[in-house]
């Protein structure tokens, strides 16, 4: 209040008349004591569900555009043939995922869309579509730290965010914080000069990058839906001119109307179709010990010197633990695996047991079964 009063100190308003003449007050002081001043005893919230309470001030101001009947085929073609590379199953999921985020902006996304593609392929254009719909409640984050570290007051009124050229793989702390941001219904709001405050989170997230390894994806990953964006329109300025005319014109309003009417009553966003990009992210996210196991399984060779293939030596179903430890040690040196990520003999034995269901003796299964595992 004091800062606001200082700002308006030179702005006066007539509040009455005395014998000596008109009386004046500072704008803020006059407003504070006015009988028609609106008072919100319930405080300030951000709730896109549209709750109306005269005692609560809701920071959600609604969508940025109004729906309009008509065709949105330009935008739909972009989503199907560029974002989803023509895959109908992926396209159906993305449409319902977008419809959910638009129809239920009050709900946390729970699944982040991950788009990997070459520069100029159109990855960021999806963000422009959502920016037109959500307006000030949309954010483009050009620094991953804006999402996972430091002050984050900018996220309080955000329902849809795009993390541009963001890579979250390889940093356990950052990866863990990101997963929490995607699924947690609350977040700790940190503002400079204020205590940390727990507030509801409404965030739905898209991550875009041209890096090979973007996210740490586990074998049973359910927080990400990764897609490789098609490069078919790179350099086609006419295509993107037409697309942006649609986004900045009335067609986006037609798309908004379609999304608001889209049937998602039976849509489970946590059940996603398989994608090649998910398998790629999972392979790149394997722990070094699992990467080593994949390497020897694919090579059919468990010998310590990984680079000297001996074609005449058959796959051995029985190998000594010493040989396996030696083989893994060579792999760690060749790949420059950090000490933190290395496993000892006992941990390696436990990993083999968990993969191949063997106890006491660490026998490898036949080559085909090992590759399958």
Predicted segments with their positions:
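Intein modules and their embedded homing endonuclease domains
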Residues: 1-67, 73, 103
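P-loop NTPase catalytic core of nucleic-acid-dependent motor ATPases
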Residues: 46-162, 174, 225, 229, ...
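Positively charged interface segments
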Residues: 145-146, 193-194, 220-223, 229-247, ...
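AAA+/SF3 P-loop NTPase mechanochemical coupling elements
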Residues: 150-156, 190-208
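Conserved AAA+/SF3 P-loop NTPase catalytic/coupling segment centered on the Walker-B
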Residues: 159-182, 214-221
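Conserved catalytic/switch belt of AAA+ P-loop NTPases
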Residues: 175-197
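Phosphate-sensing "switch" segment of ASCE/P-loop ATPases
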Residues: 199-202, 217-286, 290-291
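Positively charged, polyanion-binding regions of nucleic-acid-associated proteins
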Residues: 286-318, 326
């Amino acid at each position: 209040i004091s800062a606001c009063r200082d700002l308006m100190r030179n702005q006066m308003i007539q509040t009455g008349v005395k014998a000596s003449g008109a009386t004046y007050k500072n704008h803020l002081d006059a407003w504070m004591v006015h009988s028609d001043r609106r008072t919100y005893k319930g405080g300030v919230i951000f709730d896109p569900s549209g709750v109306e309470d005269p005692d609560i001030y809701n920071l959600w101001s609604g969508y940025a555009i109004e729906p309009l009947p008509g065709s949105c085929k330009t935008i739909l073609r972009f989503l199907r043939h560029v974002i989803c590379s023509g895959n109908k199953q992926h396209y159906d999921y993305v449409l319902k995922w977008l419809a959910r985020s638009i129809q239920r902006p009050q709900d946390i996304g729970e699944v982040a869309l991950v788009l990997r593609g070459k520069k100029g392929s159109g990855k960021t254009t999806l963000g422009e579509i959502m920016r037109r719909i959500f307006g000030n409640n949309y954010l483009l984050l050009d620094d991953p730290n804006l999402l996972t570290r430091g002050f984050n007051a900018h996220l309080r009124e955000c329902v849809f965010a795009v993390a541009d050229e963001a890579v979250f793989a390889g940093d356990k702390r950052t990866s863990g914080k990101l997963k929490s941001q995607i699924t947690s219904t609350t977040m700790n709001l940190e503002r400079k000069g204020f205590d940390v405050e727990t507030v509801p989170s409404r965030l739905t997230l898209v991550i875009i990058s041209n890096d090979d390894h973007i996210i740490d994806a586990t074998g049973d990953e359910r927080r990400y839906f990764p897609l490789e964006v098609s490069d078919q329109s790179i350099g086609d300025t006419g295509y993107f001119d037409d697309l942006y005319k649609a986004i900045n014109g009335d067609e986006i309003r037609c798309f908004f109307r379609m999304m608001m009417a889209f049937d998602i009553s039976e849509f489970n966003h946590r059940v996603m179709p398989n994608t090649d990009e998910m398998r790629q992210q999972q392979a790149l996210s394997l722990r070094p010990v699992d990467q080593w196991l994949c390497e020897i399984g694919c090579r059919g060779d468990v010998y310590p010197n990984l680079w000297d293939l001996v074609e005449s030596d058959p796959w051995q179903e029985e190998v000594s633990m010493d040989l396996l430890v030696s083989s893994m040690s060579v792999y760690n040196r060749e790949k420059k695996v950090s000490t933190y990520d290395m496993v000892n003999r006992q941990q390696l034995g436990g990993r083999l047991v968990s993969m191949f269901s063997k106890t006491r003796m660490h026998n490898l299964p036949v080559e085909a079964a090992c590759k399958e595992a």
